[in-house]
Structure formats: structure tokens, C-alpha cells
Amino acid sequence: MQKDSRLVLALDETSGEKALAVAESVSGIVDAIKINWPLVLSEGPEMITRLSELSDVICDFKVADIPNTVRLIVENAVSRGASAVIVHAFTGDDSLRAAVEASGGAEIYAVTEMSHPGAVMFTAQHAEEMARLGVECGVDGFIAPATRPDRIRAVRSVVGEGKKILSPGVGAQGGKASDAIRAGADYTIVGRAIYGSDDPRASAEAFAADIRTVL
């Protein structure tokens, strides 16, 4: 995945037509498009392939299963054009290693801590431990919340500079893109504040400009 704008679009649309229109409008501004189950369940897994023709695609499936099932999901997503797949780290080393082994050159990002308030109840308490496990298992990067920049710093202190950190929660959830980058994130992830706006391209450009202020 290129590292130009440091901006990733979380395209949580359920309409394939609208998703493609938004993807086309932000082409050249965002470094990747992240899709989740709502779009895939509504329009089918072929959306991975169609969007991959416009941008790198991150499949945010937050895979949390036994190793064999993890392997099947990752292989399927990559075969359809995914550049990366997001998996949960709490499943343990065997499932994480299965994801890495099945990636076929695509990148695997492990969730250490999600961006919503409820994340602090359980997984946040083990974020650093899961980050260390991810490094041991060979994942390419980690998910840490832009809504809590101090947690980005904590994960960065564990994983070092050789691993990517992607930070969701910018925009609608209250996080600020430049704060996340300043805290150590490589990319910020923005969803509704871009695809739900009247002018997605202008909104994406505004977030990219905010990021540039700290580069």
C-alpha cells in the first residue's frame, strides 16, 4: 500500500453503485479503501474485485476464528483482489499465524484496540500484549484507535517503527487525523465524514490537508 496521503477511506456503504461512485470520486486522494461486511453482504464479494480496480482494498473482516477458518477467509479475500485483511489478535498465535501464512503476499493487520468507547472494557487491557504477539507472528501492521491517541503511542512503543499502524475513529467518532499521525499512526481511517458528505472528494482533500500539517 502506498503512503502518500496517509488517508484510508472506510467505505461502509451498502449500495454497490454508491460505493463505486464514492471510490471513483476519491481516487488519487486516498491511499486505500477499507470495506467491511455491510457492503460485501449487500452486494457480494465481487465488490472486492471491482474496488481493487480503483484502489488498494483492505478487507476489514475482523476475522476471529479457528486457524482453518481464518485461512479460508483470508485466502478467499486475497484471491478476489484484497491488498490486506484485518484480523483480531485476541484469537491467539495459531490463528494469527494462519492468517499470515494464507496471505499470499497481501498484508495482515491485527486489531489491538478498537475505536468505540466499549473497547476499553476488555481488549484495551491487553492491547500491548496482543501487539507483541502480532510482531512475533509476523503480521504487517496493527489497528489502534484515533479516538485515543495515547493508545497509538502505546502500541507504537511495543511494535517499533517496522510495523504499520492504521487508526480508525477519525471524523464521526471524534478523532482527528493529524493527532493520530502525530501520535505514531502511519495511516488514518475515515468513513462517514467522507462517504456520507455532500462532496466526498472535497472532504477527503480536507482530511489529507490536515494530515499534511504534521508531516
Enumerate the predicted regions with their spans:
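C-terminal helical cap(s) of enzyme catalytic domains, especially alpha/beta-barrels
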Residues: 99, 179-215
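Alpha-helix-loop-beta-strand connector modules within alpha/beta enzyme cores
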Residues: 41, 45-61, 101-113, 153-170, ...
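Short beta->alpha connector loops
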Residues: 13-16, 38-41, 89-93, 146-150, ...
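A C-terminal functional module that forms or caps the active site or interfaces directly
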Residues: 139, 146-194
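Short, acidic/turn-prone active-site loops that include or flank metal/cofactor-
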Residues: 62-65, 90-91, 113-115, 170-173, ...
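Conserved N-terminal beta1-alpha1 strand-loop-helix module at the mouth
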Residues: 1-59, 64-72, 79-82, 121, ...
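Conserved anion-binding
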Residues: 2-7, 65-149, 161-162
